[in-house]
């Protein structure tokens, strides 16, 4: 990712929330395939892992005070900057969060990161927030993960919301799509 003066713009050393959510999903999917193919040795070895992963995930990433997921955890503890990576943990087929936790993450993302064109990479309330990606290359690189809006993250937000709200979310999803009509007609896909 972006590096300025030899240092990462957004250092995320340690355990990242989305990587751990993807790992949990990979293990759960592998177990599903192993059961279907009757690979009992694999199932016996890996069956206890999802619950252990889920428990560790919640202990590491759940930020109890504000009720959302930390972006990453390192030797200094939780990084509680509000970033969009936590929505990935809510959008994957195998979830680790209870309904209340998931609702809280979605609400946090909606309040702090959702825009008509995507999710911000950092909450505007954060002092490191850069609302515009302009200037020379180092300046743009600094802004890249510090507030820039990424449309591709809407997929995860929409999946999480449909999972939480079902068809009741459809009108909001349609409104989100309408926000891209001009972009699609002018620039294409």
Question: What do the PLM-derived regions correspond to, one by one?
Answer:
Residues 22-25, 29, 152, 156-159:
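Short amphipathic alpha-helical face segments that pack within enzyme cores
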Residues 24-133, 182-189:
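Catalytic cores of carbohydrate-active enzymes
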Residues 107-117, 121-132, 138-149, 155-189:
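Non-catalytic C-terminal accessory modules of carbohydrate-active enzymes
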Residues 11, 18, 38-48, 77, ...:
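A structural signal for alpha-helical segments
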Residues 4-21, 70-97, 135-153, 163:
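Solvent-exposed loop and edge beta-strand segments that line ligand/cofactor-binding
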């Amino acid at each position: 990712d972006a590096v300025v003066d030899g240092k990462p713009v957004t250092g995320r050393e340690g355990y990242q929330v989305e990587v751990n959510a993807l790992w949990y999903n990979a293990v759960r999917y592998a177990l599903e395939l192993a059961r279907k193919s009757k690979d009992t040795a694999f199932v016996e070895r890996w069956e206890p892992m999802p619950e252990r992963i889920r428990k560790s995930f919640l202990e590491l990433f759940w930020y109890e005070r504000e009720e959302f997921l930390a972006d990453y955890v390192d030797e200094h503890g939780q990084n509680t900057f509000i970033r969009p990576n936590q929505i990935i943990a809510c959008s994957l087929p195998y979830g680790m969060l209870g309904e209340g936790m998931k609702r809280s993450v979605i609400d946090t993302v909606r309040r702090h990161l959702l825009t008509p064109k995507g999710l911000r990479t950092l909450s505007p309330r954060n002092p490191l927030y850069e609302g515009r990606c302009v200037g020379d290359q180092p300046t743009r690189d600094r802004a890249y993960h510090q507030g820039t809006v990424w449309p591709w993250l809407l997929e995860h937000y929409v999946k999480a919301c449909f999972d939480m709200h079902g068809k009741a979310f459809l009108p909001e999803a349609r409104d989100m799509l309408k926000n891209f009509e001009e972009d699609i007609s002018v620039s294409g896909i």
